[in-house]
Amino acid sequence: FYLGIRYGEKDRLLDSLYFKNLIPKRNNVSINSNMLKIFDSPNCNTVEKITSTLLGEPEKSTLTLNDFSHIKDKQEKVLKILKSAVKTNAKGVNILLHGHVGTGKSEFSRLIANVSNIPLYAVKTEDSYGEEAKRTERLADLYAKQQILSRIGNACILFDEAEDVLNRGFGSDGTASKGYLNKIIETTPVPVIWTTNNIYDVDPAFLRRMTYCIEFEKLSEDSRLNIWNRVLKKNELTVSKEKVEELNKN
């Protein structure tokens, strides 16, 4: 497996993860690339650190539910869906957040997971060179996280900026099939929160498989102003009323 190389102590730790069913026993490009990070890091020497390297750190939010009071009824619905899915180990639970850029979709995902006390792990958006990850790389990372987290439990996944995956033209270039993604969505062993800026370009076949969808409309000027004031207060920053209003318009 992992390039056919044996690395003593770290190899035994990886075997421990296999034994505990925390890593699927199959060849996966995303997992193999992360394993190279494990072997290159002298501090990656415990099961916990290896697992952290494979998954990344859980996403954290800096906002509160009050910052999304304009969708309070939908907050409660999503919280119930997420908590129930994790508690019952339900499969195929997918939540789609769509709307304009800058309306808080990603931050809302983090907040809902944090409030539910459910660790949220994001599918990578960059490759190992810091460049934009290809669609196939992101899907491989999604699959790897699904397999690992299904064994750990009490977790969910964020697939941010999913336009390149959920669009109507998915599979037309031969890199993957629509049926393959349908299966990933239908059978996901842990809840996945998807975000997109343009729902009109999402393939209807994928939309039908979403458990719940929320539209994020542009915030009113008053709502934005309230958020600015809360953020400034939380960070103990003093800004003039005129400057806050100027920031609010940008």
Can you annotate each of these PLM segments?
Residues G4, S61-D67, K124, E161, ...:
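Short, solvent-exposed coil/turn linker segments
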Residues F1-Y2, D141:
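Accessible peptide chain termini
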Residues K249-N250:
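The conserved phosphate-sensing helix
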Residues P58-K77:
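Dynamic helix-loop-helix/coil hinge segments at AAA+ ATPase domain boundaries and subdomain interfaces
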Residues Y2-S61:
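Interdomain "pre-motor" coupling segment immediately N-terminal to P-loop NTPase/helicase cores
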Residues G4, Y18, T64-N66, L97, ...:
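Compositionally biased amphipathic helical and low-complexity segments enriched in hydrophobic
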Residues K72-E245:
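Walker A/P-loop NTP-binding motif of AAA+ ATPase domains
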